[in-house]
Amino acid sequence: MSLELEWMPIEDLKLPSNVIEIIKKRGIKKLNPPQTEAVKKGLLEGNRLLLTSPTGSGKTLIAEMGIISFLLKNGGKAIYVTPLRALTNEKYLTFKDWELIGFKVAMTSGDYDTDDAWLKNYDIIITTYEKLDSLWRHRPEWLNEVNYFVLDELHYLNDPERGPVVESVTIRAKRRNLLALSATISNYKQIAKWLGAEPVATNWRPVPLIEGVIYPERKKKEYNVIFKDNTTKKVHGDDAIIAYTLDSLSKNGQVLVFRNSRKMAESTALKIANYMNFVSLDENALSEILKQLDDIEEGGSDEKELLKSLISKGVAYHHAGLSKALRDLIEEGFRQRKIKVIVATPTLAAGVNLPARTVIIGDIYRFNKKIAGYYDEIPIMEYKQMSGRAGRPGFDQIGESIVVVRDKEDVDRVFKKYVLSDVEPIESKLGSERAFYTFLLGILSAEGNLSEKQLENFAYESLLAKQLVDVYFDRAIRWLLEHSFIKEEGNTFALTNFGKRVADLYINPFTADIIRKGLEGHKASCELAYLHLLAFTPDGPLVSVGRNEEEELIELLEDLDCELLIEEPYEEDEYSLYINALKVALIMKDWMDEVDEDTILSKYNIGSGDLRNMVETMDWLTYSAYHLSRELKLNEHADKLRILNLRVRDGIKEELLELVQISGVGRKRARLLYNNGIKELGDVVMNPDKVKNLLGQKLGEKVVQEAARLLNRFH
């Protein structure tokens, strides 16, 4: 697993001088050991490689060299695939450098019902696994020109949610030239063989990692730390996290603390903030961040106020409940070393590149959602992802990763399980009906008609054991035929019109089946019923429902004005999802009725990030339901769902639909205009002074011009 530490001078690369110049401009004079090894294994000759190495070991530059050398020799296009939108943006900014030598770089994510024909003009495309999967289903011609794929963060194959789509994309991508990049994985030889690639495996890190465990001593407020090399040290403080955080800050380090829930992340951040008076902070830099925070429109007032009080002390929390703009601000403040401590949930470890001198893992247990009162230990991969964030190149000589345990008895076990063990082997996540049926539907959509043998061969190319493929394959074909997603044409299987629409919309076949049954069995219904139906599907958003809240929702069910489109289920799990869907529907109803965002957040106990994600998912599902109802010729439903989709997208009452077509006019500005007598596009054009008065000179002028352009287009 370890490599001889060889550093290759940039000048020794068999690459044109203009390519070498771009790399040099970044201050890189030599390739590090993983990069050197990749070049020695034929990266620049287009050899298929699987590179596994820790976070921060320079994998992106390996991808850049692979793509650029391949395109210079062979022409065509290359696609770089990441599991997260935040990473897509990060990689796009890096790859923009190559426009200096004539390559056109583009980024695409979201909006699954399109073939993105505009990408035919680009050479290097950065996207997500889901987006690429959806593009293949639409069969755009430009995709045939792509002959080099970089599959980033391939260890996401093991992710229960994202794994199936990563595997689906990999099965198709491995039929062409590829470079796969991953965090350290234990069965890398097996995965390399599956990819038809040569493994390049290394544990090299730019900053050495020191791992340890902290536990309480008998003496009050004293904590002992044992490191992997058996050295020890003592720290003092009100609890283990505070003690080690203050110790690291006293050495001018930054600290990333991981907690297992949002509540814990927020309360720990508040606790740490109380001790920051002893830490030297750049108050001017922090007040600059606070000014930027005031300018951010997204986010609830309460979360902004809490963040303000924390950031003023050099601390912040970070989790998916925060809006993207707030998360971005916190990340940038930390990168610039203005914010000293971030307390986050583990999602941060899997996402953007945000190293710190010290990582403190506050919990190795996580609440089990399926069994009340039961806690699971976190996977080893999650521990490695979190600890891998320790040590910032260019700032830190070492990185420290410390796990908090309750007592001395836990120390040995935690060392053996997390510090000294390999991560779990990667296994297929296509082994469920939901994942496997979606996979087959996607293959037929991308490939066109296939014989049973051809379709089966695609399934055999997965990581799933052959016996399991046989079981799922027969079951899937039977179900997809019975539910009219596919049909037999001679000796081949083909998608029905309905099946093709489902594949193009990029929704799960079980979601489509629930929507179809709900619509076909009922006349046009109320908004809440449609929202509830869509939230109840496998693709619907999940939201946390407290016990008291659940009782209130059950009572509310009995008093609804209109009939829901799904019968109450008997099974406990299904019933729980049914209640969850009702909460989502109520949130969306308030959003569409223009209830103030702060009110929604406090009423339903959610974060602004949750609301944004919910709106995005329900926008996609209402759009999909509208198109399915048209396909099924359910015109009454289609009319209702079209309006519902537009209202969900912008969070508006129906009367504002015309105004929000204007770029720069969202729910608040549209309501302001409407309440002041500007109700249609024509009113905007006819009353320019009034519009400028309401929206400000600069924006008002733009809005009037845009309204005039829209009017001309319509007439």
From Swiss-Prot:
Keywords: ATP-binding, DNA damage, DNA repair, DNA-binding, Helicase, Hydrolase, Isomerase, Nucleotide-binding. InterPro entries: DEAD/DEAH_box_helicase_dom (IPR011545), Hel308-like_dom4 (IPR048772), Hel308_helicase (IPR053416), Hel308_SKI2-like (IPR050474), Helicase_ATP-bd (IPR014001), Helicase_C-like (IPR001650), Helicase_Hel308 (IPR022965), P-loop_NTPase (IPR027417). Residues 40-203 form the Helicase ATP-binding domain. The keyword Phosphoprotein does not apply. Gene3D superfamilies: 1.10.3380.30, 5' to 3' exonuclease, C-terminal subdomain (1.10.150.20), P-loop containing nucleotide triphosphate hydrolases (3.40.50.300). It comes from the Archaea. Its EC number is 5.6.2.4. A motif (Q motif) lies at residues 8-36. Changing residue 59 to A: No helicase activity. Wild-type binding to ss and dsDNA. Disulfide bonds: none annotated. It catalyses: Couples ATP hydrolysis with the unwinding of duplex DNA by translocating in the 3'-5' direction; ATP + H2O = ADP + phosphate + H(+). Changing residue 669 to A: Increased helicase, 3-fold decreased binding to ssDNA. It is an enzyme of class 5 (isomerase). A motif (DEAH box) lies at residues 152-155. Belongs to the helicase family. Hel308 subfamily. Crystallizes with 5 domains; the first 4 form a ring through which ssDNA may pass (seen in A.fulgidus crystals). The C-terminal domain (654-715) lies perpendicular to the ring and is able to bind ssDNA, which may cause it to may act as a molecular brake, inhibiting helicase activity. This is ATP-dependent DNA helicase Hel308. It comes from Saccharolobus solfataricus (strain 98/2). The lineage of its organism: Archaea, Thermoproteota, Thermoprotei, Sulfolobales, Sulfolobaceae. The gene is hel308.
